[in-house]
């Protein structure tokens, strides 16, 4: 009989962290973080990274594993999960996936498109073109070759622009066509996924604003200031494009006022939550939806997982 993998998804500020600790204790699990921002070292406050005290003795994985200058793709995530699950099971524990990066969950559920691997020389050529003519030029080039892909990719998203152009240069085919081909990877096991959603969206919005202001009190700007000193980082770096960090960077660059930074940071976080909830709605026929306000949510999730 195939092993089961358990999952808890939800929008930012929905209470995933504290609930996941309770669940992990009940089912004897280790937690694998499903969060594209928690992988970065030195980005603790703005990502609401669980402290050792908050982890409460539960082993966590895929937290603080790379520098902010690096990238951690969906493929990297899937590969890591497939390696970690075996190690966790060998220790006699269950696997509990927890987070809000829905592209990571999507990769586990659906697998990845069979795209060619990255080639260093092509990346270097694209980097040279970007320095010479700018990222907007590369996005324009993509639009001329593959308008369908260009339309879906933000003109400031260097990682995805580079990847789309790289795939086109290697394969000679449109990126938008290749991503529709057969999928590879993902999980071999069944994923029992629960998702927290708010009955009242205004409660989630209040949680988001409250947590953002709490982060400021905890020294979030000092954290970003420390990152800002690194000449290898810009506001277009994948890590710095994380919600809150991008807006703080603009403030430190002098592009916006402090009040604008706070307002934009809160709005951007609410927009992130809206996108996360859209993903969850699209999956609602195959996952278990639990109201974040529900006082019996822990018991309801345990029952869905098959525990009493």
UniProtKB/Swiss-Prot annotation:
Site (Interaction with substrate tRNA): 101, 123
Cofactor: Mg(2+)
Keywords recorded for this protein, A-Z: ATP-binding, Magnesium, Nucleotide-binding, Transferase, tRNA processing
Binding site for substrate: 12-17
Superkingdom, natural source: Bacteria
InterPro entries on file: Dimethylallyltransferase (IPR039657), IPT (IPR018022), P-loop_NTPase (IPR027417)
Catalytically driven reaction(s): adenosine(37) in tRNA + dimethylallyl diphosphate = N(6)-dimethylallyladenosine(37) in tRNA + diphosphate
Signal peptide from the UniProt entry: none
Gene3D superfamilies from the UniProt entry: 1.10.20.140, P-loop containing nucleotide triphosphate hydrolases (3.40.50.300)
One GO BP annotation of this record: tRNA modification
Enzyme Commission code(s) on record: 2.5.1.75
Ranges where the record places region Interaction with substrate tRNA: 35-38, 159-163
Binding site for ATP: 10-17
Example GO molecular function: tRNA dimethylallyltransferase activity
Role, per record: Catalyzes the transfer of a dimethylallyl group onto the adenine at position 37 in tRNAs that read codons beginning with uridine, leading to the formation of N6-(dimethylallyl)adenosine (i(6)A).
NCBIfam families: miaA
Subunit structure: Monomer.
Family: Belongs to the IPP transferase family.
Protein name according to UniProt: tRNA dimethylallyltransferase
Organism: Francisella tularensis subsp. holarctica (strain LVS)
Gene: miaA
């Amino acid at each position: 009989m195939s092993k089961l993998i358990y999952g808890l998804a939800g929008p930012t500020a929905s209470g995933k962290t504290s609930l996941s600790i309770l669940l992990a204790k009940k089912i004897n699990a280790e937690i694998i973080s499903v969060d594209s921002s928690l992988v970065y070292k030195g980005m603790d406050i703005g990502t609401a990274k669980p402290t050792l005290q908050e982890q409460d003795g539960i082993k966590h994985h895929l937290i603080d594993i790379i520098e902010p200058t690096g990238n951690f793709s969906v493929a990297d995530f899937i590969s890591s999960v497939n390696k970690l699950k075996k190690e966790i099971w060998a220790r006699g524990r269950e696997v509990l996936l927890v987070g809000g990066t829905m592209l990571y969950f999507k990769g586990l559920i659906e697998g990845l498109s069979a795209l060619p691997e990255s080639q260093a020389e092509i990346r270097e050529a694209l980097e040279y073109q970007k320095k010479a003519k700018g990222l907007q030029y590369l996005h324009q080039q993509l639009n001329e070759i593959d308008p369908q892909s260009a339309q879906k990719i933000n003109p400031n998203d260097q990682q995805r622009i580079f990847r789309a152009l790289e795939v086109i240069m290697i394969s000679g085919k449109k990126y938008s066509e290749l991503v529709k081909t057969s999928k590879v990877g993902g999980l071999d096991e069944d994923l029992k996924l629960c998702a927290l959603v708010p009955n009242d969206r205004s409660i989630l919005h209040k949680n988001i604003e409250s947590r953002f202001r709490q982060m400021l009190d905890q020294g979030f700007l000092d954290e970003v200031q420390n990152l800002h000193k690194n000449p290898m980082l810009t506001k277009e770096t994948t890590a710095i494009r994380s919600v809150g960090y991008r807006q703080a960077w603009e403030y430190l660059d002098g592009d916006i006022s402090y009040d604008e930074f706070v307002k934009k940071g809160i709005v951007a976080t609410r927009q992130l939550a809206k996108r996360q909830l859209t993903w969850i709605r699209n999956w609602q026929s195959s996952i278990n939806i639990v109201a974040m306000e529900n006082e019996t949510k822990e018991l309801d999730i345990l029952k869905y997982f098959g525990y009493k």
